Amino acid sequence: MSDTVLAARDGAVTTVTINRPAQRNAVDRETAAALAAAFRAFEQDDTAAVAVLTGAAGHFCAGADLRAFAEGRGNRVAPDGDGPMGPTRMMLSKPVIAAVEGYAVAGGLELACWCDLRVAAADAVFGVFCRRWGVPLIDGGTIRLTRLIGQSRALDM
């Protein structure tokens, strides 16, 4: 597994941590692949009952790594296989909890919405900041967000 994603076990709980604090845990291609691999391993492990997805150093996830996109190393965007943020197309049989501190914006919001439950710090920030650059939520986030909080509140974001 990559150093950009850490997976740790404590009994039946698997904690998956996005570990790119200098980039506010923005997800590049390597990190997306590592996230997908971590959740595949969690799903296949019969002794794991629940997963917690979090980010290192007080940041959940600032979305896709725009610097990597600018350098031609953007996330995988294809109609099949893993999603651009890694596990966002997976249908797991076990619950995943998002433990959100700091920013969960753009693709980070999509990751949080993909989880079955979200637990947020008092100062957590959720947002669709990608719309500022004309980039939509691209991997089910629009549908998940409106189902979670309703269309009116989703439009406010």
Spell out what each predicted region is.
Residues 90-157:
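Crotonase-fold acyl-CoA enzyme core
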Residues 58-66:
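Amphipathic alpha-helical interaction surfaces in cytosolic regulatory modules
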Residues 62-63, 71, 108-109:
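Short glycine-/acidic-enriched loop or helix-start segments at secondary-structure transitions
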Residues 57-59, 102-103:
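Short glycine-rich anion-binding loops that position phosphate/pyrophosphate groups of nucleotides
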Residues 16, 53, 65, 111-113:
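Hydrophobic/aromatic residues within transmembrane alpha-helices
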